[in-house]
């Protein structure tokens, strides 16, 4: 009797597992092609996604480097309830036990490249449309180059040598690009080029709050050149 019960339970389990697999393993009903997505009506979605990558967390999103700059340089205290509270930043504060495998560093690196990837995708999509199809084309490309320049500036300031990819870089080539493919000065020049384009193509004012304008691009360009001129 006991064997029959165990057999029944095992059979029911196998039947349920098979049923679940059949239920979950469905063929896609439809796939969006590039022509479906890259349209004048949809292209702003690529731009908004790039802005969204800026985030608002002060530890590992690309908008602020205070734990990696101000805390390390004695301009700010880590804070918290003790040395074990966000211990990684305590190590930055005392310049001790700093390791390259800290999750916060990896998170910052990863999220900056998520933002760069979204900017590249947006620029590539915008380039597929004509100015007639999408009158804001140049302005939106300038916005994306401004935001991409910001992401790269953050990476360059913290890591110095980073792999450089833009909208013309095939995705399959990403793993093959060395962080020494560009020299220190070439990286600064590439970042500056984005802000130069932005300063030439952004309007003096923006109707929507949060979008960069010409003066912001000039200011960021000046900041990049100052950092570039500082030997370190």
Question: What is each residue range found by the language model?
Answer:
Residues 156-157, 163, 206, 227-232:
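Short coil/turn linking the two alpha-helices of tandem helical-hairpin repeats
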């Amino acid at each position: 009797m006991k064997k029959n019960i165990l057999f029944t339970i095992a059979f029911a389990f196998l039947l349920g597992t098979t049923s679940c697999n059949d239920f979950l393993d469905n063929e896609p009903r439809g796939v969006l092609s590039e022509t479906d997505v890259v349209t004048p009506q949809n292209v702003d979605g690529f731009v908004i996604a790039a802005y969204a990558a800026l985030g608002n967390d002060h530890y590992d999103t690309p908008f602020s480097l205070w734990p990696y700059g101000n805390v390390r340089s004695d301009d700010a205290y880590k804070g918290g309830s003790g040395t074990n509270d966000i211990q990684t930043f305590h190590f930055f504060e005392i310049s001790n036990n700093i390791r390259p495998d800290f999750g916060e560093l990896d998170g910052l690196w990863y999220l900056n490249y998520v933002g760069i990837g979204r900017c590249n995708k947006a620029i590539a999509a915008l380039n597929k449309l004509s100015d007639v199809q999408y009158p804001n084309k140049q302005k939106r490309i300038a916005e994306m180059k401004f935001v991409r320049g910001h992401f790269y500036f953050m990476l360059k300031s913290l890591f110095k040598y980073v792999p450089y990819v833009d909208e013309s870089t095939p995705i399959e080539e990403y793993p093959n690009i060395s962080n020494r493919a560009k020299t220190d000065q070439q990286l600064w020049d590439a970042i500056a080029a984005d802000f130069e384009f932005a300063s030439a193509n952004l309007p003096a004012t923006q109707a929507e709050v949060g979008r960069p304008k010409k003066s912001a691009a000039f200011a960021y360009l000046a900041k990049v050149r100052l950092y570039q001129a500082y030997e370190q």
